[in-house]
């Protein structure tokens, strides 16, 4: 095409020779051994108890990630040293939620077994996927601590609606896949949960940190206080980020938005801090609904959560 120097690929954006975007560093997985972080999408939203277009989120988060600069001023270099592979999306059954959860577990378990050095960056999807992702992590890695950023406990009973985006941690605790004392819930909000589910979480010794508690003590000090306690009892840490932990002004594209949540910068700093810890097994982002979003604000915030996780991993003295 040298004969037509001003003709370019349809839809292509402005290209600055001095800027490296994440799109320049993200590549389709070639089937080779995976070492370190790599992306995988889980486009499930049928299990949401409210209207949800979270199945579209892996695509919009990817786009927001690709449009971001790869350069971190804090690092003084790109946030990834080599290519960041994208494994694609896990196939979701058209109508069967239970079968979809099995697809997720089976795929994650097989990949983690075959690639023990893989650190999954999971793009949900509604929060129901956490049952399958964390189950796969726990069965392949060992005793796992879960840091759950969420406005809700997500321990609803399964009798009233089956496996939904409100039940993943109930199922994980009931089936003893994780222990309550190894689950840290950060950002639990007022008027977003029931007394029965708070009682269930407390009965199982879940580490609950409400927004009121976080506002009084600070998010990072809270994490610094509780994290060593669970690290001493577990082999790995998994980070689960429900984007509705953010205040509705920061994340309008969530099915269950509400006031009084975390600010984006607080979440980013917290994820970066946790990602610097030893034996981080991965991170998932759930409950982004692009159909409700404004100018992709929530997908952009989710992409920055991933970027700060990558930055934390690169800053880690344990890598």
Curated annotation (Swiss-Prot):
Cofactor(s) for this protein? Mn(2+)
What Enzyme Commission number does this protein have? 3.5.3.8
> Which of UniProt's keywords are assigned here?
Histidine metabolism, Hydrolase, Manganese, Metal-binding
Give GO terms: molecular function aspect only.
agmatinase activity; formimidoylglutamase activity; manganese ion binding
**Record note on cofactor:** Binds 2 manganese ions per subunit. Can also use other divalent cation, with lower efficiency.
Q: Show which residues constitute the signal peptide.
A: none
Q: How does activity depend on pH?
A: Optimum pH is 8.7.
Q: Which Pfam families match?
A: Arginase
Q: Name one GO biological process term.
A: putrescine biosynthetic process from arginine, via agmatine
Annotated binding of Mn(2+) 1, by residue:
127, 150, 154, 242
- Presence of keyword Metal-binding: yes
Looking up SUPFAM superfamilies in the UniProt record yields:
Arginase/deacetylase
Which pathway does the database say it acts in?
Answer: Amino-acid degradation; L-histidine degradation into L-glutamate; L-glutamate from N-formimidoyl-L-glutamate (hydrolase route): step 1/1
Record field: catalytic activity: N-formimidoyl-L-glutamate + H2O = formamide + L-glutamate
Which residues are noted in the entry as Mn(2+) 2-binding?
150, 152, 242, 244
Recorded coiled-coil stretches: none
Q: Which family does it belong to?
A: Belongs to the arginase family.
Cross-referenced PANTHER family? ARGINASE/AGMATINASE, FORMIMIDOYLGLUTAMASE
Role noted for this protein: Catalyzes the conversion of N-formimidoyl-L-glutamate to L-glutamate and formamide.
Q: Could you tell me what this protein is called?
A: Formimidoylglutamase
Species per Swiss-Prot/TrEMBL record: Bacillus subtilis (strain 168)
Q: What is the lineage of its organism?
A: Bacteria, Bacillati, Bacillota, Bacilli, Bacillales
């Amino acid at each position: 095409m040298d004969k037509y120097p001003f003709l370019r690929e349809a839809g292509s954006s402005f290209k600055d020779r001095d800027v490296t975007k994440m799109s320049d560093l993200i590549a389709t997985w070639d089937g080779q051994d995976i070492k370190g972080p790599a992306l995988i999408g889980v486009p499930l939203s049928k299990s949401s108890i409210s209207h949800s277009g979270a199945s579209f989120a892996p695509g919009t988060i990817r786009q927001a990630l690709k449009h971001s600069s790869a350069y971190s001023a804090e690092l003084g270099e790109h946030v990834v040293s080599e290519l960041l592979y994208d494994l694609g999306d896990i196939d979701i059954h058209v109508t069967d939620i239970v079968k979809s959860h099995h697809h997720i577990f089976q795929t994650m378990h097989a990949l983690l077994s075959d690639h023990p050095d893989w650190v999954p960056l999971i793009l949900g999807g509604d929060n129901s996927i956490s049952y399958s992702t964390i189950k796969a992590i726990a069965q392949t890695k060992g005793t796992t601590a879960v840091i759950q950023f969420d406005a809700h406990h997500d321990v609803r009973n399964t009798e009233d609606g089956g496996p939904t985006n409100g039940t993943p941690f109930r199922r994980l605790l009931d089936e003893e896949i994780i222990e309550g004392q190894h689950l840290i819930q950060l950002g639990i909000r007022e008027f977003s949960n029931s007394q029965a589910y708070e009682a269930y979480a407390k009965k199982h010794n879940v580490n609950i940190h409400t927004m009121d508690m976080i506002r009084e003590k600070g998010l990072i000090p809270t994490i610094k206080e509780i994290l060593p306690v669970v690290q001493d009892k577990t082999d790995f840490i998994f980070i689960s980020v429900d984007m509705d932990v953010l205040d509705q002004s920061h994340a309008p594209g969530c099915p269950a938005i509400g006031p009084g949540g975390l600010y984006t910068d607080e979440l980013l700093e917290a994820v970066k801090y946790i990602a610097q810890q030893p034996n981080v097994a991965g991170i998932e982002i759930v409950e982004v609904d692009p159909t409700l979003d404004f100018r992709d604000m929530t997908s952009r915030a989710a992409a920055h959560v991933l970027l700060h996780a990558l930055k934390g991993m690169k800053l880690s003295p344990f890598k």
